[in-house]
């Protein structure tokens, strides 16, 4: 094609490899080599000895050996958890400006196999021949010293914490799980649908939603306007009203006198202007500081969207509209809950993966959820093992074994009623829970973890929950006491996935909305899916941060999302 863009030859060369793998691979969009491409080789990079490369990264630690010998830098560029040992001859550069933790360096050097017995565990190191660029650090002020900081402390330096080994590993694990999510659903012919962040629907019916409004801006502008241009007085309104009457009388008199058409037309035009002026003056005279009100309530017709709007708590309802046309779909994006909760399991902003499957029932839903979770576990074991080893070493020694267990073990499946019976039996034998156990409760985290970690010792799917603790859109079972809902429970975190077969029967779902005290009007569009060509379908939601907690073994959800939002905190 005449307009085809041909990549430059240097760019093509940068991504080529010799058949024997002896040529180092350069980054495609940067004139450097990713440290991962050196250290992740089966030989640890030893086969690249003699190659000249350019690397860039941040100094994790440095040793200034004095003017007569090499200084050593441990450099990391974020592409992998391992650091590359870099040797700098003091004759090339003032190494005192290089050794501080956090210093950014770009250097050219020759890869060399370190002498045996040198003390390094790496198979390769870089002997610098030229220092290209340096981003210096004042070690006395740098917030991330060599000493290990707690994850809680790192939350106070969100803009820098990704430079630490732990948070950078979490970032790579998070990236891998996101990649795995898209890969799984794309491989199974699901379409990725972008659902809205701003919505007028409350999927959960909980009411704990962030409101999206411009009324505060409107109010601030109004208050300033009333200061700059004081509203008309009652006398101003009365004067404008009298002018309207006067202009009206003139028109009436001209018509009675059978005046010329031109005179009447001119008088009517003046009357129209008088009426418009009166309406404007009368409207401004009614303006008051504060939010606009109508019948004692906030008048949302003055808001940006002409009605109340919120940040979404779930993309499920919206993505269902596409499932009812395109069959298999999923959405993956941020959701928001205005819960004033400070626990280690709650965020105000978090990510959800929500697939919907048409022509499918609850069993299909459970099968898909199990396959998806296993796929993600295998993905981490195959593509992110070094990062998982770091998490196992520093935080949870059992995290890799847990991934292997979930990836290789068939999930158990029991009804909610059976789960309650098992918990009641445990209580009868002396097991103590903080939360009571009885039919009709929403299982607490301690119940879920006891089922998975103690009784079954593997992932568990609990299904057919009481309708009173589940959402209106879940399909009512024939017993009319339970709904076709399911939760996937895993060790470490408890509930990982919540899903259901959706209620496709118009009369039943309308009654459920009414029973839960929700207004019908906001859900009329959702009911249309049942009015016109209704279809059996199901879906589920996976809390993405919970999946990362499960994988990494970390205890606080604030440490597995780049920029955590929770009550009192919305930094950056």
Curated annotation (Swiss-Prot):
- Gene Ontology process terms (BP): asparaginyl-tRNA aminoacylation; embryo development ending in seed dormancy
Give the UniProt keywords, A-Z: Acetylation, Aminoacyl-tRNA synthetase, ATP-binding, Cytoplasm, DNA-binding, Ligase, Nucleotide-binding, Protein biosynthesis
InterPro entries assigned: Aa-tRNA-synt_II, aa-tRNA-synth_II, aa-tRNA-synth_II/BPL/LPL, Asn-tRNA-ligase, Asp/Asn-tRNA-synth_IIb, NA-bd_OB-fold, NA-bd_OB_tRNA, WHEP-TRS_dom
Residue numbers bearing the N-acetylalanine modification: 2
- Output the Gene3D superfamilies linked to this UniProt entry: Bira Bifunctional Protein, Domain 2, Nucleic acid-binding proteins, S15/NS1, RNA-binding
| Protein family per UniProt | Belongs to the class-II aminoacyl-tRNA synthetase family.
Q: Name one GO molecular function term.
A: DNA binding
Keyword flag Cytoplasm: yes
Name of this protein: Asparagine--tRNA ligase, cytoplasmic 1
Species source reads Arabidopsis thaliana
Q: Which SUPFAM superfamilies would you find in this protein's record?
A: Class II aaRS and biotin synthetases (SSF55681), Nucleic acid-binding proteins (SSF50249)
Tell me if ATP-binding is a UniProt keyword of this record.
yes
Q: Which residues bind DNA?
A: 53-131
Q: What happens when the gene is disrupted?
A: Embryo defective. Developmental arrest of the embryo at the cotyledon stage.
Its gene is: SYNC1
GO-annotated cellular components:
chloroplast; cytosol; mitochondrion; plastid
Quickly give the catalysed reaction: tRNA(Asn) + L-asparagine + ATP = L-asparaginyl-tRNA(Asn) + AMP + diphosphate + H(+)
């Amino acid at each position: 094609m005449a307009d085809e863009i041909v990549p430059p030859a240097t760019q093509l060369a940068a991504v080529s490899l010799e058949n024997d793998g002896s040529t180092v691979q350069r980054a495609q969009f940067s004139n450097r080599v990713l440290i991962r491409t050196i250290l992740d080789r089966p030989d640890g990079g030893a086969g690249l000895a003699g190659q000249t490369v350019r690397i860039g990264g941040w100094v994790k630690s440095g040793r200034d050996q004095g003017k007569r010998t090499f200084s050593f830098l441990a450099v990391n560029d974020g592409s992998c958890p391992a650091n590359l040992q870099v040797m700098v001859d003091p004759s090339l550069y003032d190494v005192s400006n290089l050794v501080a933790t956090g210093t950014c360096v770009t250097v050219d050097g020759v890869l060399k196999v370190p002498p045996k017995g040198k003390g390094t565990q790496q198979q390769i190191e870089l002997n610098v021949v030229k220092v290209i660029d340096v981003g210096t650090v004042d070690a006395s002020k740098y917030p991330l010293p060599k000493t290990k900081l707690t994850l809680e402390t790192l939350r106070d330096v969100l803009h820098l914490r990704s430079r630490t080994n732990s948070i950078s590993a979490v970032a790579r694990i998070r990236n891998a799980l996101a990649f795995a999510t898209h890969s799984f659903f794309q491989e199974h012919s699901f379409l990725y649908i972008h659902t809205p962040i701003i919505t007028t629907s409350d999927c959960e019916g909980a009411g704990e939603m962030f409101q999206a409004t411009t009324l505060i801006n409107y109010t601030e502008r109004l208050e300033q306007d009333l200061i700059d241009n004081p509203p008309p007085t009652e006398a101003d309104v009365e004067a404008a009203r009298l002018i309207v009457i006067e202009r009206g009388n003139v028109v009436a008199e001209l018509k009675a006198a059978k005046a010329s058409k031109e005179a009447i037309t001119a008088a009517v035009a003046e009357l129209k202007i008088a009426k418009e002026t009166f309406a404007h003056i009368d409207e401004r005279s009614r303006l008051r500081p504060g939010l606009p009100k109508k019948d004692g309530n906030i008048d949302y017709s003055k808001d940006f969207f002409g009605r109340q709007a919120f940040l979404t708590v779930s993309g499920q309802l919206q993505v269902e509209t596409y499932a009812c046309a395109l069959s298999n779909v999923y959405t993956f994006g941020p959701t928001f809950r205005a819960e004033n909760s400070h626990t280690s399991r709650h965020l105000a902003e978090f990510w959800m993966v929500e697939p919907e499957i048409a022509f499918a029932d609850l069993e299909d839903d459970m099968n898909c959820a199990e396959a998806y979770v296993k796929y993600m576990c295998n993905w981490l074991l195959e593509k992110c093992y070094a990062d998982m080893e770091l998490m196992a070493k520093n935080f949870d020694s059992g995290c890799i074994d847990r991934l292997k267990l979930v990836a290789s073990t068939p999930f158990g499946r029991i009804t909610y009623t059976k789960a309650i019976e098992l918990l009641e039996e445990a209580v009868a034998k002396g097991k103590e829970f903080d939360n009571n156990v009885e039919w009709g409760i929403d299982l607490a985290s301690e119940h879920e973890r006891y089922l998975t970690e103690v009784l079954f010792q593997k992932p568990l799917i609990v299904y057919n929950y009481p309708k009173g603790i589940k959402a209106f859109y879940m399909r009512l079972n024939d017993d009319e006491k339970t709904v076709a809902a399911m939760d996937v429970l895993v060790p470490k975190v408890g509930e990982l996935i919540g899903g259901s077969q959706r209620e496709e029967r118009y009369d039943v779902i309308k009654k459920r909305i009414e029973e839960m005290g929700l207004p019908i009007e906001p859900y009329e569009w959702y009911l249309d899916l049942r009015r016109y060509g209704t279809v059996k379908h199901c879906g589920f939601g996976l809390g993405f941060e919970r999946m990362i907690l499960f994988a990494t073994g970390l205890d606080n959800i604030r440490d597995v999302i780049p920029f955590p939002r929770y009550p009192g905190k919305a930094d950056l």
